[in-house]
Each structure stands twice: as structure tokens, then as C-alpha cells.
């Protein structure tokens, strides 16, 4: 999800073919390296923010008009428990997920007077590659 030009063009391409979008589910995320913030590589920090936050902002900009063309549009964004808890060593990932949640909540409030249903989903512990990367000793 860090192909910003592709994301920006996505809305137009969907419009050309279908004119609307009924549902969006955004699950794009990368973990980055867990560790002290002062040890986090700048490029990796920015990459995590770009994938987990900035790409979703661009996606919202690209597809909101398409969602509004639908009868009962829905947009859901997957988040994480670390978005709501301050945990050491989770740096860019936690920051990006907390920021994503705030952005989605703001977008939801901005669309309160229309029929666009916007939600944040926290799936909890899920046996994924990212979960195994973050918790290598955990039994899944």
C-alpha cells in the first residue's frame, strides 16, 4: 500500500468500471522493527507511517466519492490493541495505528449526516505472519 500514485488513481479506475464502491476493508499494515524509539531507523519509521497511515489517507481521498455513490456504503479499517495502549518498544507501529484510528474517527464524524458507515475493527489476537513476528514465542 505504499504505491501512492496507484492509490490516487484507484478511485478513477473503479469509477470508470462500476461508478460506485459498496464496501472498503483496509487491512494494509507493516510492523517494522520493535525496539526503543531512539534505535528505530528513520527510513523504516517513515515506511511504517506511510503504509499504515498515509496510504489510508490517500485511499480515503480516492474512494470517498465512490462510496457516496452507493446505497449503503461501508468502510472498515483494521487496527490493533496497541493503538489504545502505550507500550514501550512498539514505536512506529503503535503511533501509526493510533493515528489511523483518530483519522478514521474524524472521517466518520465528518460523514455523520450521510449514509456512509465507517468503522474500526480490532480483530484481537490473530494467527498472522505479523503476529508471529511480533510475538515469536507465543503459541498460536
Task: Give the ranges of each region predicted by the language model.
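A short helix-coil junction within the Rossmann-fold of NAD(P)-dependent oxidoreductases
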Residues: 17-18, 31, 35, 62-71
Amino acid at each position: 500500500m505504499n504505491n501512492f500514485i496507484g492509490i490516487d488513481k484507484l478511485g478513477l479506475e473503479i469509477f470508470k468500471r462500476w461508478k460506485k464502491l459498496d464496501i472498503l476493508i483496509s487491512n494494509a499494515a507493516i510492523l517494522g522493527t520493535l525496539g526503543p524509539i531512539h534505535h528505530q531507523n528513520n527510513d523504516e519509521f517513515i515506511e511504517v507511517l506511510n503504509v499504515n497511515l498515509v496510504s489510508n489517507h490517500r485511499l480515503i481521498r480516492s474512494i470517498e466519492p465512490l462510496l457516496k455513490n452507493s446505497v449503503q456504503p461501508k468502510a472498515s479499517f483494521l487496527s490493533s490493541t496497541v493503538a489504545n495502549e502505550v507500550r514501550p518498544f512498539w514505536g512506529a507501529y503503535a503511533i501509526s495505528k493510533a493515528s489511523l484510528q483518530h483519522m478514521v474517527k474524524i472521517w466518520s464524524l465528518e460523514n455523520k449526516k450521510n449514509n456512509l458507515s465507517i468503522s474500526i475493527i480490532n480483530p484481537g489476537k490473530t494467527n498472522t505472519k505479523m503476529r508471529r513476528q511480533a510475538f515469536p514465542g507465543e503459541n498460536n
